[in-house]
UniProtKB/Swiss-Prot annotation:
GO terms for biological process: chorion-containing eggshell formation. This protein is one of many from the eggshell of the silk moth. This is Chorion class B protein PC401. The keyword Metal-binding does not apply.
Amino acid sequence: TKSILILPSALMIQSAVGQCLGRWGPGLGRCGGCGGCDGWGGRLGYGAGIGEIGLGCGLEASYGGGLGVASASAVPPVGLGVASENMYEGCVGVAGNLPFLGTAGVEGVFPTAGAGVINYGCGDGAVGITSEGGYGGLGYGGLGYEGVGGYGLGYGGYGLGGCGCGCGRYL
């Protein structure tokens, strides 16, 4: 009974490590480092063809790391605030992008010799919507994840993927 619990646990942990590493891990995922999944030795397009160290696919927004929002309330936060309580002297320029719609404001005491200004622009027409790459068809060949033509012509073919030696399509 121990092996019934330990073996699936080990497989789940290895799968999770493969998912976290994506394409860049040292061969800890589904098929290991050098060589292919099923003895074909890479570049033959018989596998999933996306690095083979854990399926390195998913939504693009998940790769940049998240902007952590912490709340001590039982109700989830409905807004996001970026605040600074530092004192700045001289010219200060801040640039960047915040997710979703928002407002900008300056609070605090400004000395009579200084000035505070906010220049705020909103969006490029894609307000609150991100264009993300999604998952493929997850089929085996044909028009699925292996691409048009099955073996060797889709993501798993020469030059675009294959089982590789731990770096997927980059080798």
